[in-house]
């Protein structure tokens, strides 16, 4: 149906652009704090762990946690705030969950770029009387611009191609990935689904072309290799405290989301009866719900795909580097 398809395209682009921007900003925040700000050992380690959690966890865990915490029967909305008609499904639910899922990608990309910026350039600007904000906007940011574009591109593509999160928390908010799936399973229209998939591919290729053309016209060149000297970390409280507070808020929210799932699995009935804690759901998963078979199949597929992926990545990277 053309109206549904065009609506799904619009929804997908809206979510993709917002998630790309938010993920890039949060990733830049965590990367900047790690590279430039002097942090305590515990705080710095906590931020590193939090920024890597979404990478190693299943993609739908945050969606499930969002529903369990902020849904109509959520702990925070219903039992703490006494809000009984709150709905997390739709545009904002997808955007929040995807942002928390994909910002670690931006963090890892931007952290490497920040470490490769020569500190002598920034210190020279400081010696000439520039403020830290002026140094960031006139020296650091121009050098980061290609990396920011790449980070936005990657998260945008991952957002519009994401299926698990919109399927769980999207509700009636259609995206291209879920529309393609429903076109196959619901309408039994494989040709139509293939056409939609081509459109999705064209969108990602168009974004890549625009980003590449835009960045290639920039005159700023990113620095690669080792910095000429060590970087003096920021100890000024006027800079350190606000950045630490922002990172702490994101970190606490992510930790709360991940704690919710294992604890919620021990509740007798979610949303109504929380005590006494029970392990019956784990027993049912592996006895009645074919959980052991699903676990075995997933483990076997991982063992098969991991070495193949590693081998192909090594071959492709070798050819790309050696052909230059």
Residue ranges and their predicted role:
Residues 1, 277-286:
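A short amphipathic helical element positioned immediately N-terminal to and/or at the very start
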Residues 104, 123-124, 134:
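Internal catalytic domains of large membrane-associated glycosyltransferases
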Residues 1-115, 143-163, 193-212, 239-269, ...:
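Membrane-water interface segments at the C-terminal ends of transmembrane alpha-helices
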């Amino acid at each position: 149906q053309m109206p549904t398809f065009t609506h799904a395209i619009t929804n997908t682009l809206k979510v993709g652009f917002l998630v790309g921007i938010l993920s890039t900003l949060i990733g830049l925040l965590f990367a900047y704090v790690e590279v430039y700000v002097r942090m305590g050992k515990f705080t710095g380690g906590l931020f590193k762990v939090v920024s890597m959690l979404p990478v190693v966890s299943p993609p739908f865990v945050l969606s499930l946690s969002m529903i369990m915490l902020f849904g109509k029967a959520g702990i925070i909305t219903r039992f703490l705030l006494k809000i009984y008609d709150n709905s997390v499904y739709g545009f904002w639910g997808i955007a929040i969950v995807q942002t928390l899922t994909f910002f670690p990608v931006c963090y890892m990309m931007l952290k490497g770029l920040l470490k490769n910026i020569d500190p002598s350039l920034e210190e020279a600007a400081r010696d000439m009387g520039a403020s830290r904000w002026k140094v960031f906007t006139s020296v650091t940011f121009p050098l980061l611009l290609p990396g920011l574009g790449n980070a936005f591109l990657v998260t945008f593509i991952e957002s519009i191609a994401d299926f698990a999160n919109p399927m769980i928390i999207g509700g009636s908010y259609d995206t291209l990935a879920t529309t393609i799936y429903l076109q196959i399973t619901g309408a039994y229209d494989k040709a139509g689904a293939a056409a939609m998939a081509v459109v999705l591919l064209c969108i990602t290729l168009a974004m890549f072309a625009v980003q590449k053309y835009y960045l290639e016209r920039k005159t700023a060149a990113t620095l690669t290799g080792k910095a000429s000297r060590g970087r003096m970390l920021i100890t000024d409280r006027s800079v350190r405290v606000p950045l630490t507070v922002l990172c702490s808020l994101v970190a606490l929210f992510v930790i709360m989301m991940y704690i919710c799932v294992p604890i919620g699995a021990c509740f007798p009935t979610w949303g109504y009866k929380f005590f006494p804690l029970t392990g019956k759901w784990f027993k049912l998963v592996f006895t009645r719900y074919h959980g052991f078979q699903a676990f075995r199949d997933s483990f076997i597929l991982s063992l098969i795909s991991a070495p193949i992926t590693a081998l192909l990545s090594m071959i492709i990277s070798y050819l790309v580097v050696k052909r230059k």
